[in-house]
């Protein structure tokens, strides 16, 4: 029987392995651990900015009324906690690091929505769509500032190293986002460039999440390096799956319009691979990408035909296989260092969740 995963270009998995059908315990625990401190940090903001950040984080509606909304997956905080546990520490000791990476991640989302002019995230209007460009910029900046503050408030002797890891990852994230933006006006984006962009835009913060957890736990260098490599691999897998969902994801699950990435003519990984290796389908896709006459006005039927070009050219299957290859490599990296059974299993679960998710 064909599984749901095939709909997204992913090989069917046994029902017992479909982690996208349930919330991983480690993700639920991550939410529980970071929320009190995350709220305390948001309370430091001024009365103009606090409700905007509260809305984006899923705690309130646009009028400031409390809601229990989808506030994200918490994959990066979970990775901080599991990395700390893998190094033999109590996960609670890594709360400042987990809150920090979650704030950096959300800073990037608010700015990304603004730059892409995306009007919906997590089934709600985005910050810029409600409050305008200026407030969206400031909300993102505010969360980035809080990401530094929460670490500086920590009394760990490893705060300096953790803060450096966060800052370097943020710089890499900005580099990747800048490349992604530059690609919009180019017609000759190479696959290697697209992969380098994904390493900065997505994988850098995943790797830093693992590194921060290990640093705050005082892990030896060999453990830190293995966890960082794991984070980088699952970060690339995450971006590959994100790109698949940006074309074939179901709007009622992703919270974004159908064919959202194609409508914006984004040079995503499956698109770029198809252009380079997809034969006649790739050539037709390349011609469509440079044809600006229908930009932003393409019908769903036209976009469905473009998605079919990517399918026929092999981009969908390549992205799926590449995501699973990175997951396997990431798991192999941590298997070599002999960490305790529970965090080892949690790292495997996180990796498989990333490729099996539907949003």
From Swiss-Prot:
Cross-referenced Gene3D superfamilies: Farnesyl Diphosphate Synthase
Amino-acid positions noted as binding (2E)-geranyl diphosphate in the UniProt annotation, renumbered to this chain: 121, 201-202, 239, 256, 266
Pathway the protein takes part in: Isoprenoid biosynthesis; farnesyl diphosphate biosynthesis; farnesyl diphosphate from geranyl diphosphate and isopentenyl diphosphate
Superkingdom, taxonomy of origin: Bacteria
Catalytic activity: isopentenyl diphosphate + (2E)-geranyl diphosphate = (2E,6E)-farnesyl diphosphate + diphosphate
InterPro entries, per the entry: Isoprenoid_synthase_dom_sf (IPR008949), Polyprenyl_synt (IPR000092), Polyprenyl_synt_CS (IPR033749)
pH effect summary: Optimum pH is 8.
Places the protein is found: Cytoplasm
Similarity comment: Belongs to the FPP/GGPP synthase family.
Record-given protein name: (2E,6E)-farnesyl diphosphate synthase
């Amino acid at each position: 029987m064909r599984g749901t995963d095939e709909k997204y270009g992913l090989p069917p998995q046994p029902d017992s392995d479909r982690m996208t059908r349930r919330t991983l315990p480690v993700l639920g625990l991550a939410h529980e651990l970071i929320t009190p401190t995350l709220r305390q940090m948001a309370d430091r903001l001024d009365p103009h900015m606090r409700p905007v950040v509260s809305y984006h984080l899923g705690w309130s509606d646009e009028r400031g009324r409390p809601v229990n909304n989808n506030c994200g997956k918490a994959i990066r905080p979970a990775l901080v906690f599991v990395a700390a546990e893998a190094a033999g520490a109590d996960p609670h000791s890594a709360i400042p690091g987990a809150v920090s990476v979650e704030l950096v991640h959300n800073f990037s989302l608010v700015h990304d929505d603004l730059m892409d002019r995306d009007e919906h995230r997590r089934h709600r209007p985005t910050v810029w769509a409600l409050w305008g460009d200026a407030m969206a910029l400031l909300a993102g900046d505010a969360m980035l500032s809080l990401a530094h503050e929460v670490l500086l408030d920590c009394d760990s002797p490893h705060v300096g190293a953790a803060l450096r890891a966060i800052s370097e990852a943020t710089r890499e994230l900005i580099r990747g986002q800048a490349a992604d933006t530059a690609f919009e006006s180019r017609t000759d984006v190479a696959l290697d460039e697209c992969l380098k962009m994904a390493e900065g835009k997505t994988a850098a913060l995943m790797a830093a999440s693992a590194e921060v957890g290990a640093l705050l736990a005082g892990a030896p260098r060999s453990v830190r390096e293995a966890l960082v490599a794991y984070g980088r691999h699952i970060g690339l897998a995450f971006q590959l799956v994100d790109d698949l969902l940006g074309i074939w994801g179901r709007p009622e699950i992703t919270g974004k319009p159908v064919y959202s990435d194609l409508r914006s003519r984004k040079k995503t990984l499956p698109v770029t691979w198809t252009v380079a290796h997809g034969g006649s389908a790739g050539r037709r896709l390349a011609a469509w990408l440079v044809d600006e006459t229908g930009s932003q006005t393409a019908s769903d039927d036209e976009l469905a035909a473009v998605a079919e070009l990517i399918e026929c050219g092999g981009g969908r299957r390549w992205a799926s296989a590449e995501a699973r290859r990175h997951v396997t490599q990431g798991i192999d990296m941590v298997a070599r260092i002999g960490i305790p059974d529970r965090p080892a299993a949690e790292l495997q679960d996180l990796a498989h969740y990333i490729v099996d998710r539907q949003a």
